[in-house]
Amino acid sequence: MAIKYGRPIELREVSRRDGAAASPALDLAIRPRRNRKAEWARRMVRENVLTTDDLIWPLFLIDGNNKREQIASMPGVERLSVDQAVREAERAMKLTIPCIALFPYTDPSLRDEEGSEACNPNNLVCQAVRAIKKEFPEIGVLCDVALDPFTSHGHDGLIADGAILNDETVAVLVRQALVQAEAGCDIIAPSDMMDGRVAAIREGLDQAGLIDVQIMAYAAKYASAFYGPFRDAIGSAKTLTGDKRTYQMDSANTDEALREVELDISEGADMVMVKPGMPYLDVVRRVKDTFAMPTFAYQVSGEYAMIAAAAGNGWLDGDRAMMESLLAFKRAGADGVLSYFAPKAAEKLRTQG
């Protein structure tokens, strides 16, 4: 007899297919484990699948030629000179990764209070876009729109009397987006979190005849502790004064995220993003369920660094943790993921067939 919720359940004798001795079994009509009994069976009923089409690969740029610099806080990630970024774009294409994202490390000598270098049509990002699109016009290129890689204070906007100026910053962001789009960028991705910037950028692009350039809005970007290694990578970690809580979102809020997403969609965003990723999967799900818009998540530098560091110390299976974390985004409703794991995950997917 077996006991279930205090009541006895009869066990019956069943014969095994291999002729072995009979064993007692519960009289169950439903056995979920039957669908998990073999890999082929698990594949047949799998609800979510990760493919290389789901990946966007962020690359960090640095001035110079034939340069690759390791980023200490992001094991396995490097800053790349433009020629090396072109090589990685070729690698992305061979791995069938559809899109790369570009982020610059700006020399301190080029940083100023206004982030002027952001609007230089020959800045590092624009150089890289032109070089990549010349060699590989069929790969998608996404460019970040924000001033923090270019300002001496490390903030995403202009500052006056200790406050971030919203409308004045938006005017600069429009100019930044235009030089990127004119260089050949396919997707403009404003990450600054200034109010009204999506509408202003859309208007600026359309007036310049760049109507086919897409906008992926960082619609729900939280003031997060998980950005630390990224700020190291772009050189703003040591320059940042204060925090970004007056423009990035409070990590306690999800209704606010929906309002932000709705605003960006109404202003002309073609796609929306939630950042960071794994700590905010609930937000990804709510956004996708509410708006049914192309929804992306950014597996940010801190998320990457945690897994990479733990794997490097032998504390977990790095490949399994990588793939599990990426699949979690798909399960939560994301249409794609920006991840520093993109090339490694693509290699893994290729070997899996």
Swiss-Prot record:
Matching Pfam families: ALAD (PF00490)
Cofactor(s) it depends on: Mg(2+)
The keyword Transmembrane helix belongs to this UniProt entry's keyword annotation: no
Gene3D superfamilies cross-referenced by the UniProt entry: Aldolase class I
Database matches in InterPro entries: ALAD (IPR001731), ALAD_AS (IPR030656), Aldolase_TIM (IPR013785)
Domain of life (superkingdom): Bacteria
GO molecular function (one): zinc ion binding
CDD domains in alphabetical order: ALAD_PBGS_aspartate_rich (cd04823)
Substrates-to-products reaction catalysed: 2 5-aminolevulinate = porphobilinogen + 2 H2O + H(+)
GO BP terms in the entry: heme biosynthetic process; protoporphyrinogen IX biosynthetic process
Residues annotated as binding Mg(2+): 260
Cleavable signal peptide: none
EC numbers: 4.2.1.24
Pathway assignment: Porphyrin-containing compound metabolism; protoporphyrin-IX biosynthesis; coproporphyrinogen-III from 5-aminolevulinate: step 1/4
Binding site for 5-aminolevulinate 1: 231, 244
Alphabetic keyword roster: Heme biosynthesis, Lyase, Magnesium, Metal-binding, Porphyrin biosynthesis
Binding site for 5-aminolevulinate 2: 301, 340
Active site, UniProt feature: 221 (schiff-base intermediate with substrate), 275 (schiff-base intermediate with substrate)
Gene Ontology annotations for the cellular component aspect, listed alphabetically: cytosol
Family: Belongs to the ALAD family.
Binding partners and assembly: Homooctamer.
Role according to the record: Catalyzes an early step in the biosynthesis of tetrapyrroles. Binds two molecules of 5-aminolevulinate per subunit, each at a distinct site, and catalyzes their condensation to form porphobilinogen. Required for nodule development.
Protein name: Delta-aminolevulinic acid dehydratase
Organism of this sequence: Bradyrhizobium diazoefficiens (strain JCM 10833 / BCRC 13528 / IAM 13628 / NBRC 14792 / USDA 110)
Gene: hemB
